[in-house]
Design a protein with these regions (language model features):
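PLP-dependent enzyme catalytic core of the Aspartate aminotransferase-like
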Residues: 77, 108, 147-148, 318, ...
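Active-site phosphate-binding strand-loop segment of PLP-dependent enzymes
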Residues: 135-203
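N-terminal small-domain helix-loop-helix segment of the aminotransferase-like
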Residues: 1-88, 268, 372-376
Length: 376
């Protein structure tokens, strides 16, 4: 089976080594276990003693019950039996495609987005199509265009909300309309929600798993909870037939998740409100820095992100995004992701949730480079 190179991952693997100012990664101030204990107020000694005593077997095949209880609290209608743990959100997305999609099915994906959501279906589905999100529409989908892409063989509509790389956020009404479109077609909706809950104003964001019975919401401990090292994600879906299908396919490639990872994640989710509040504060402070820089610049523009930790920044001079980001990395130590990794040009993605000082320094280096480039 042929599949396209994962452009973002290839780029990050190659250019992260140049990073003095990391504006490429999109997690929020990754936490250590020490920081997790400080934030939660949990007794570190008691927890570590229980962790050391934990038998390193396969654990609970469908996920630790305490963890699933914590995950269920992130939704309105999702229960513990509707949840299946996976190895990261990437593992969850892959499992959904592998379990549901037949070669003759139509899969509709929105771009720009996380490449996994369109390259995997394109690799084994003969009828994979994309709907282009446009800057002039605030990177929100044109629902008339979506309706026109629906065919009798449509199996799955893939969305990413909040959107990576643009930071666009679909409101509840739009999500409900997408659910209605899918329902008429008898299709599932895969909603990658790894940034759900991260916004400057701590806005409560709806989940597709709550809106639509055949909605499949994917999330993880990586972005919202700053614990990417756990490599733990999940699927939330109220459609029992889909969950049974996911379990059946999951048994062939992972069996279960790490009992250690699930125990730490359970601790974190007991304190989810505190972690989300911490991270929304970081989003707000860093977005203020980015927005001020954009507004003071002659050469850069963006659609201000509504949620998440990423922004797509456009520039008005003639240089391919790959060359610009290559030079910024090697000459200025600024690590960015070029727009070409998202099928876009004359732009780059900024992962803006760093310390405000590092973010400001990195943005200043970009300005310095552009000023020198345009002078010659």
């Amino acid at each position: 089976m042929q599949i396209d190179s994962f452009k973002v991952e290839d780029w990050m693997n190659e250019y992260e080594k140049y990073s003095k100012y990391d504006l490429g990664n999109t997690t929020v101030n990754t936490m250590s276990l020490e920081e997790l204990f400080e934030l939660s107020g949990e007794n570190k000694e008691n927890f570590l003693n229980s962790l050391c005593a934990l038998k390193q077997g396969y654990g609970f095949i469908k996920g630790n019950p305490e963890l699933k209880k914590g995950i269920a609290k992130l939704y309105k209608t999702v229960e513990e039996g509707h949840i299946l743990t996976t190895i990261g959100a990437a593992g969850a997305n892959h499992l959904v495609f592998y379990s549901l999609v037949e070669p003759s099915d139509r899969v509709i994906s929105l771009i720009p987005t996380y490449q996994q959501l369109y390259s995997i279906p394109a690799s084994f589905c003969s009828d994979a199509v994309v709907l282009k999100l446009k800057k002039e529409n605030g990177f929100l989908p044109d629902l008339d265009e979506l309706k026109n892409l629906i065919t009798p063989n449509t199996k799955l509509i893939c969305i990413n909300n909040p959107n990576n790389p643009t930071g666009a956020l679909m409101p509840l009404g739009m999500l409900e309309q997408i659910a209605q479109i899918a329902d008429k077609a008898g299709a599932y909706i895969l909603s990658d929600e790894v940034y759900r809950g991260l916004s400057p104003d701590e806005e409560k964001m709806p989940s597709m798993a709550d809106i639509y019975e055949k909605g499949i919401s994917v999330c993880s401990m990586s972005k919202v909870f700053s614990l990417a090292g756990l490599r733990l994600g999940w699927i939330a879906c109220r459609d029992e037939a889909a969950i049974e299908t996911f379990v059946r396919h999951r048994e062939y490639n992972m069996i279960s998740c790490s009992v250690t990872d699930e125990s730490i994640a359970s601790l974190a989710l007991k304190n989810s409100d505190r972690i989300i509040k911490r991270n929304c504060t970081a989003v707000r402070e860093c977005l203020e820095v980015l927005d001020k820089w954009i507004n003071s610049s002659k050469h850069f523009s963006y659609v201000k992100p509504r949620a998440g930790t990423t922004a797509m920044v456009y520039y008005d001079f003639d240089m391919p995004s790959e060359i610009l980001c290559d030079r910024l990395a090697k000459e200025k130590g600024v690590f960015l992701t070029p727009g070409c990794c998202f099928e876009e040009e004359n732009c780059f993605r900024v992962g803006f949730c760093k310390s405000p000082d590092v973010l400001q320094q990195g943005l200043d280096k970009i300005s310095e480079f552009v000023q020198n480039y345009l002078t010659f």
